[in-house]
A protein has these predicted regions:
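Terminal amphipathic alpha-helical/low-complexity segments used for targeting or macromolecular assembly
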Residues: 1-180
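Structural signal for interior beta-strand "rungs" in well-ordered beta-sheet cores
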Residues: 185-301
Length: 301
């Protein structure tokens, strides 16, 4: 085939891809001066946050008790600048998608800085709750040799730390950015935690791959999940146009001290009571009483 024939094929593809009907709902109209969220910068934000939350494990390995104040100060300053940039991008993306602004204003820049500083003020509390997650992972796994091994190696800690960062940003009203952050962890670990889920302290996921925690899930303290667990929705109420109604509670509530073993599927707005145990490979769509132990029915001989 001659180069001219190739040119014709390429030109035809360009024309078809440029038809408005072909990109309906898939095209973001970028406006001059509008920043866009950057996955690369958000990855740097996560790494900086981890270096602050887990000093010595991430970031500068030469940090010690004499220099920790300096290193955290430097990282906080970098984090603030990057957060301001990305939060602004999220705010502009959200408002432009809704058709409410053309170019991000000084007011939005000030709001981005306020939200960034508010997020940074939450880091001490975030470290405290992540410390309980590390403790739960260590205490719950006889194969764990140390807290350091848990922090360095366990995919659950990466996924949970991303979730806790994203959840705080979502609680502050930052659009889009929180979802990107949790999906980064999803891609890396296979653990899918929606940033809107509410999760208490001492939370751990053993092994982790294939876990799904839906947006309206509520998880109490000292809860342990194993690989392949789904906390999902049983059904979706529809609006007049037949589309799912968004924002309504549709995922399970797990009370304190619940254990859910591998590949269990728990669906709908049901309650798994305090101290209950859900066995592996079970489909649960009804409330489970406190202290109950739900396992597969044995096959009849």
């Amino acid at each position: 085939m001659s180069p001219l024939n190739f040119t014709h094929i390429l030109t035809q593809a360009v024309d078809e891809l440029s038809e408005s009907e072909s990109y309906k709902g898939l095209f973001h109209q970028h406006k001059d001066g509008e920043p866009l969220p950057s996955a690369k910068v958000l990855y740097e934000i996560i790494e900086l946050s981890r270096s602050i939350l887990f000093p010595g494990y991430y970031g500068n390995s030469t940090i010690n008790s004499r220099t920790i104040n300096y290193h955290i100060g430097v990282n906080i300053e970098k984090l603030f600048d990057l957060l301001c940039e990305q939060i602004l991008a999220g705010l502009c993306f959200g408002t432009n998608s809704a058709g409410k602004c053309s170019v991000c204003s000084d007011t939005e820049r000030e709001e981005a800085a306020r939200l960034a500083s508010k997020f940074i003020s939450k880091l001490p509390a975030m470290r405290r709750i992540l410390a309980t997650d590390v403790e739960a992972a260590y205490n719950g796994d006889p194969a764990a040799e140390s807290y350091g091994e848990v922090i360095f190696c366990y995919p659950a800690i990466k996924a949970i730390s991303n979730y806790r960062i994203a959840h705080e940003l979502l609680e502050l009203g930052v659009p889009l950015i929180p979802r990107i952050i949790t999906e980064m962890a999803h891609s890396e670990t296979g653990i899918d935690i929606h940033p809107a889920a509410k999760i208490g302290s001492h939370f751990t996921i053993d092994h982790g791959t294939g876990v799904v925690i839906g947006a309206t899930s509520i998880i109490g303290n000292n809860v342990k999940l194993y690989q392949g667990v789904t906390l999902g929705a049983k059904s979706f109420p529809l609006d007049m146009d037949g589309k799912p109604i968004k924002g309504i509670p549709r995922h399970p509530i797990l009370e304190d001290n619940v254990i859910v073993y591998s590949n269990a599927t728990i669906l709908g707005r049901i309650i798994i009571g305090r101290d209950a145990t859900v066995g592996g490979n079970i489909w649960v769509t009804e409330n489970v009483p406190a202290g109950a132990r739900i396992v597969q029915t044995k096959a009849k001989k």
